[in-house]
């Protein structure tokens, strides 16, 4: 993690409260679109198919780490945000380091490095339920409990969520659940912090960007209000 006026690299830090304020029914990457050097879009796809570019470089040339662990695909360097749909509710801070990095990870960080933290010690104590609704049948329910740091330096965080939406056109429907558990320990007077996190995001979603082929219209398209098969047509 870069430090201001210490690490010689251009970076921007976004707190979890800022992300929570911007979230609404947006995906995680879309909450970062106002960060300098960052461009995001949904690639005409379904839920979780968003893309993020840092200084013009896509997934394959940008390193993504969550709690210090690389999450880019080991074969092609891509990252599938549909596997991290609950990240927007768990993030305590995000740091975007722009430009060529010196990371020793397998992914070449020509565009930069995006570091996401979900540390339990950085979350304010509290318990609550959040509900959100949007257009096209989107709704989301989230329940959470954060203990904060106690006198012994221990902290924990729990979260359970559910979301569903139809999307703004055919082929964008999706549904999923999110669960997370995190335990942290910060020794008194120490310079280190220990954190254990368990994150899951079971989901399914349609992928509209594959499109519909001409043959699909010939085989299944409506003809005078009826479905017809091209093989039966003269």
PLM segments and residue spans:
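Transmembrane beta-barrel architecture of outer-membrane proteins
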Residues: 23, 27, 49, 91, ...
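A beta-strand signature from Gram-negative outer-membrane beta-barrel systems
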Residues: 85-130
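Short, acidic, small-residue-rich periplasmic hinge/interaction motif at the N-terminus
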Residues: 1-21, 59
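Outer-membrane beta-barrel architecture
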Residues: 30, 53, 95, 113-115, ...
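Extracytoplasmic beta-strand/coil segments of soluble accessory domains associated
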Residues: 29-70, 86, 92
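Short, glycine-/polar-rich solvent-exposed loops and beta-turns at beta-strand/coil boundaries
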Residues: 7, 38-48, 106-110, 172-175
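Transmembrane beta-barrel wall of Gram-negative outer-membrane proteins
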Residues: 126, 133-164, 168-210, 216-220, ...
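Short acidic/polar hinge/loop motifs at secondary-structure boundaries
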Residues: 70-98, 223-224
């Amino acid at each position: 993690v870069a430090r201001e006026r210490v690490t010689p690299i251009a970076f921007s830090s976004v707190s979890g409260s800022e992300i929570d304020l911007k979230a609404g029914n947006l995906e995680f990457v879309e909450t970062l679109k106002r960060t300098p050097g960052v461009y995001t879009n949904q690639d005409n796809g379904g839920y979780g198919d968003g893309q993020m570019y840092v200084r013009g470089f896509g997934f394959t040339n940008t390193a993504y780490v969550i709690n210090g662990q690389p999450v880019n695909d080991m074969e092609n360097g891509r990252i599938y945000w549909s596997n991290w749909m609950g990240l927007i509710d768990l993030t305590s801070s995000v740091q975007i380091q722009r430009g060529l990095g010196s990371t020793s990870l397998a992914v070449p960080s020509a565009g930069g490095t995006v570091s996401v933290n979900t540390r339990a010690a950085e979350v304010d104590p509290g318990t609550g339920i959040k509900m959100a609704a949007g257009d096209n049948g989107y709704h989301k329910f989230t329940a959470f409990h954060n203990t904060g740091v106690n006198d012994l330096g221990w902290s924990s965080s729990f979260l359970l969520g559910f979301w569903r939406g139809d999307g703004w056109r055919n082929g964008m429907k999706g549904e999923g659940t999110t669960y997370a558990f995190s335990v942290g320990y910060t020794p008194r007077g120490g310079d280190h912090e220990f954190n254990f996190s368990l994150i899951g995001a079971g989901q399914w979603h349609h992928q509209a960007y594959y499109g519909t082929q001409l043959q699909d219209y010939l085989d299944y398209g409506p003809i005078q209000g009826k479905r017809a098969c091209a093989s039966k047509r003269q």
